Design a protein with these regions (language model features):
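Feature captures the catalytic cores and cofactor-binding loops of soluble hydro-lyases/lyases
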Residues: 1-87
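Active-site/ligand-binding-proximal alpha/beta "capping" segment
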Residues: 13-14, 91-116
Length: 116
């Protein structure tokens, strides 16, 4: 149940969302513009979960509905369908095209520019 670094999936995350009807992606580290556009197009969200907390996260899974591409990608990278309750995650990319990752990057760049 522990999240994996998401940016590795960036090149094809939009296709995966379309093919499997995914409305939520759980990971850590954030995603980029292609995934943000796919979230907007498919009414989906990116959920940033806590790395290193697999046991806590696993306790929130109430049912495994299915798994796809397990042989191709292995367990950590497979596409898992879960039912969850009280899953501790932060929505950092939403279906309106908003990205907390982009917002924080812009604020950080502004703060650093003011120090120069």
């Amino acid at each position: 149940a522990g999240p994996t670094t998401s940016i590795r999936e960036e090149p094809y995350q939009g296709d995966i969302m379309r093919w499997f009807g995914i409305r939520g992606v759980i990971g850590k580290g954030g995603m980029a513009d292609k995934t943000l556009a796919a979230c907007k197009e498919h009414g989906a969200v990116y959920l940033h979960a806590i790395g290193g907390a697999a046991q806590v996260l696993a306790e929130c899974i109430t049912k495994v509905r299915g798994v796809h591409m397990l042989e191709e990608f292995g367990s950590p990278e497979a596409i898992w369908e879960f039912e969850m309750k009280a899953f501790p995650a932060v929505v950092t990319m939403d279906s309106h095209g908003e990205s907390l990752h982009k917002d924080i990057l812009a604020k950080s760049e502004d703060a650093l520019a003011q120090r120069r």
